[in-house]
Amino acid sequence: MATMQSLLTKVLPILISLMIGRLLGKFKLLDAIGVTTIKTLVTRVTLPFVIFQAFYTVDYSLDTLLVALCVLTICLALFALGFTLKKFVRNLTLLLPFTLTGFEMGMLGFPLFLLLSGQERMGSIAVVDLGQEIFVFTIYLFMLRRETGSRQSLPEAVREVIKNPVIIAVLLGLLVGVTGLGRLMAGTLAGEVVDGVCGFVSAPTAALILFSIGYDLRLDRRLLSRAMKTVLLRLACVLLIGGGLTFLLFQLIPYDPFLLLAMLLMLVLPAPFVLPVYSQSPQEAEFVSMYLSLGTMFSILLYAVLIIIKPMIVG
């Protein structure tokens, strides 16, 4: 009964929000421009508040560094495996290495973990996200632009990263957390004000993200088989490499059930949603969008599995 209640209270809101997004598009209440505006609002305003609050509440230690290095290693290993497999698997996508690595933490990971574990445990997903952010905003995007012919000078790339509100939120959160200012504010009026502002501004983030994802969900029968093979290939690679390195990580650091939940959630997430933007052709962009839609559906399904096994992990 408790498991069914958890599924209903944590998965049903997600499914309904996705359905609302789909219906908004079907009945022309929302168009592509509107969805772009929603995504801009989320990524530049509400999501940075979620991320800042998560990062500044982390209790940073050597274990934090080990987790970040583990996640970075997972991303790099999957990336290298993608380039190796690309030589043998030529009928899926030219962007195969980029479909196998990277995780959509911002637009999907943070909102799902918030529903799964609550605001007080968001520090766990922040620790996991640190290594992933380093990978995506440096190696992943640099190589993706290079692969797709979107040239950009190093100074331009650095400026773009520094000006990104998500990165600013991460850096500010790290600054407040690492210096101990976050601990000093805990339980004080200043801490309550910061948490209150962050909580209020970030409140609509999950719903807005899910509306936009629901609008973008596309299942094209022509591309279904190829997209399904790519999704299953990613899941197999992530299970092998991500699962193995996660097991190794917890041999090196004390067991933390919510950190394990955060790691597992990251591993079931789809590739970064930015991928279609850099596709070389409309056909490739169409396939990548289909792949991400299918990957998102698998992520929701596996998220439901996480909800079921959460009592066994947390105890």
Regions found by a protein language model. Name each.
Residues 1-315:
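Alpha-helical transmembrane segments of multi-pass small-molecule/ion transporters
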